[in-house]
Amino acid sequence: MTPGYGSRGPLSPLYNRNALSHEDSFVRAAGGRRYIRSHIMGDVLTLELEQKAAAVRDQLASAVQQHGRVVYSNSLGAEAMVLTDIIWTQVPEIDIFSIDTGRLHEETYELLEKLERRYRKQIKLVYPDSESLAKLVSKQGVNGFFHSLDARLACCQVRKVEPFKRAIAGYAAWVTGVRRQQSATRALGQPIEWDAQNGLYKVSPLLDWTEEQVWQYIRARKIPYNTLHDRMFPSIGCAPCTRAIQPGEDQRAGRWWWEQPESRECGLQPRVRHAVGQA
């Protein structure tokens, strides 16, 4: 058992207030976002971060207790590494799946292998329906999603939304790693909401985490992550629809960058929100 990560018990003190190390940290600087060599607590968990991780664990455990069957839709991004670690080491009752759209980056597939080696577990992969995908490509071409918002949403519907709906069928709640900092639309999220679009509860335990806290947790726990993050990809999706961001851009600016910011969602995050209290 990993020190400090016993079953539901209090996290033991892994932090060391005096231990500092140089790590790559994604921070705001000179009006933009860039990687710098920053003097941070990079290889240990601070007391504050331990407490935040314990709160995530407790919220997830409470969701299981209240709702029964809970599943995590794993995006394989940085936030996903935090949740994967906490779920697999402390709340294993929660199932995990990820959507293989058929157009992911090679680095994303490599990450799946690294996670399997680290935890000796596998993330269940779900795929688009082959018949629906064939019809989509026949209608709009392989890269037709560049032509209009409707075409892009149709692609996301087949490659992401429909597989997602199949994967969550039979569950009472699903977990997401969204954070308020990520975008204006996500800033309105609540820790637990009724997802009327999909007919189950949505649990968002990382809403108030900062990007720096996410990366400090990853470094301290030595969790594998997508190496595209080291190349200015804070948000990673399908390869054709994701680019590196530039200084001063929002961290989701690299997703569907040819569209307006308010359109840069795939349809998995419902826009109509009904907060129902803490899970």
Annotate the PLM regions.
Residues 2-18, 24-26, 36-279:
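Nucleotide-activated chemistry modules centered on ATP-dependent adenylation/adenylyltransferase
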